[in-house]
Amino acid sequence: MTEYNPRDLADLVIKPIITEKATLLLEQNKYVFDVLPKATKPEIKAAIESLFDVKVTGVNTIKPPRKKRRVGRFIGHKPLYKRAIITLEEGDTINLFPDV
């Protein structure tokens, strides 16, 4: 097992994703996060376990194709991003909506 620096791991996870599909996955104890495109599955697993103090059983990643964007006569692309679907062990939860 490789040791990771906790400071570097915190930078891998950008934000949680709250969409209709992501909330349906919450019922299956799966959470969706945007992560850096260079992040690997073992790094994502270590980052989630250290940030939220939970046990991760699986990591699935999605790297969708970039969409074209036009500004005047110039054609560019939206930034590349990567999504991670995290499966947690039974009984573990991540509190995405803290009590106000």
Swiss-Prot record:
Source superkingdom: Bacteria
Gene it is expressed from: rplW
Keyword Calcium attributed: no
Biological processes annotated in GO: translation
Alphabetic keyword roster: Ribonucleoprotein, Ribosomal protein, RNA-binding, rRNA-binding
Gene Ontology cellular component list: ribonucleoprotein complex; ribosome
GO MF entries: rRNA binding; structural constituent of ribosome
Record's protein name: Large ribosomal subunit protein uL23
Assembly, per entry: Part of the 50S ribosomal subunit. Contacts protein L29, and trigger factor when it is bound to the ribosome.
HAMAP family: Ribosomal_uL23_B (MF_01369_B)
